[in-house]
């Protein structure tokens, strides 16, 4: 008799995706981040669901409802901090996952890559709206500053901002709609992640060499299930260390002050995972130019397949490209640091140079280096 996991209509889908899936025999720990992102998403949806049971999306009670969750709800504090720090873990895994795709040339799977970029935008939008919900000072002013950027769009900008706000400033209508969107988007992300996986399984996984692994596949279970469990344990360990020992390490102290439209915080800045994009935005003195640079800093990922001129898919055997990749990683860390600093003399020029470097490396230096490496192959 045929095994039920291979015959049952539902079990068959799970089996083909997670059990009998043929996987390359040489994929490294950099391939763990896909499953870790899945775990992060499930964790965020569950903790978010329990938080939504006690949260009220009204400007007068939002801040106190979060306080109530932390003080009066059974284990509310741990749920709240798991959700807040879970977002940080989510973005760490996201950036590692994207970096892996860039390093090993996974962007040549066009559909998978493009849906991945859409996923990145959706997760960023969700995280931004989630940051507004506690209605602290940084929530309010962060929402005001970021939504205001849309006013840079010619002709329709001002109307668009007022339409998003639901009034003439960030207020009750804004908070209510942000809560609604923050609740629905993770389910859209789940659907997109399934499509992402569907397209990936059409081609099969890439591997560190970038060479086809069709002649050397192994079943996903038990080899990669056990490997993913190790990754998951490390993820949960890191998350719980953050939650239990330093829950506010990655947050902003200003968000423990209730939102006050009459009092602007000295330094308005988003969560740490958006600081690199915020630094790029601030490095351009023109408002519209800054907004375009901000969007392009992420949208540039769509161009990765077009900018790939190398004869080799992966960077594994391309030392010059490897150097450039790690310079890019260091540049992103520099931008993250600059994004959290005040707008004053050495930080302004450092931010501008780091922003120029970011676009220069991706758009010019990487393709040129690839061409030089192609020449090495001829000799």
Swiss-Prot record:
SUPFAM superfamilies attached to this UniProt entry: a domain/subunit of cytochrome bc1 complex (Ubiquinol-cytochrome c reductase) (SSF81648), Transmembrane di-heme cytochromes (SSF81342)
Required cofactor(s): heme b
Binding site for a ubiquinone: 201
Keyword Protein biosynthesis in annotation: no
Free-text comment on the cofactor: Binds 2 heme b groups non-covalently.
Chain's role: Component of the ubiquinol-cytochrome c reductase complex (complex III or cytochrome b-c1 complex) that is part of the mitochondrial respiratory chain. The b-c1 complex mediates electron transfer from ubiquinol to cytochrome c. Contributes to the generation of a proton gradient across the mitochondrial membrane that is then used for ATP synthesis.
Protein name: Cytochrome b
Provenance organism: Tragelaphus eurycerus
